[in-house]
Amino acid sequence: MQEMLIKLIKIYQKATFFKPASCRFYPSCSNYSIEALRKYGIVKGGWLTVKRLARCHPYNPGGYDPVP
């Protein structure tokens, strides 16, 4: 299941390759998600991803935000 989610994220990354980057953070939200899923698994990694996506909006200054 974890690898399937990671593959879906990679498909998303390839599908949006030509779209200008809009993520306010480094690493990007999709790369953060892959790293969180690999490090913590589906439950905790998924929760970290949801929290990160909730912070990725125009009113947040963004910046460097690694997976804990």
Curated annotation (Swiss-Prot):
One Gene Ontology cellular component annotation held by this UniProt entry: plasma membrane
Q: What is its main location?
A: membrane
* Keyword Magnesium carried by entry: no
Q: Where in the cell is it found?
A: Cell membrane
> What are the entry keywords?
Cell membrane, Membrane
Could you confirm whether the keyword Membrane appears in this record? yes
Q: How does it sit in the membrane?
A: Peripheral membrane protein
Biological function: Could be involved in insertion of integral membrane proteins into the membrane.
Q: What is stated as this protein's family in its record?
A: Belongs to the UPF0161 family.
Name the NCBIfam families for this protein.
membrane protein insertion efficiency factor YidD
Q: Indicate what this protein is called per its UniProt record.
A: Putative membrane protein insertion efficiency factor
In its UniProt entry, the species of origin is given as Syntrophomonas wolfei subsp. wolfei (strain DSM 2245B / Goettingen)
Q: What is the lineage of its organism?
A: Bacteria, Bacillati, Bacillota, Clostridia, Eubacteriales
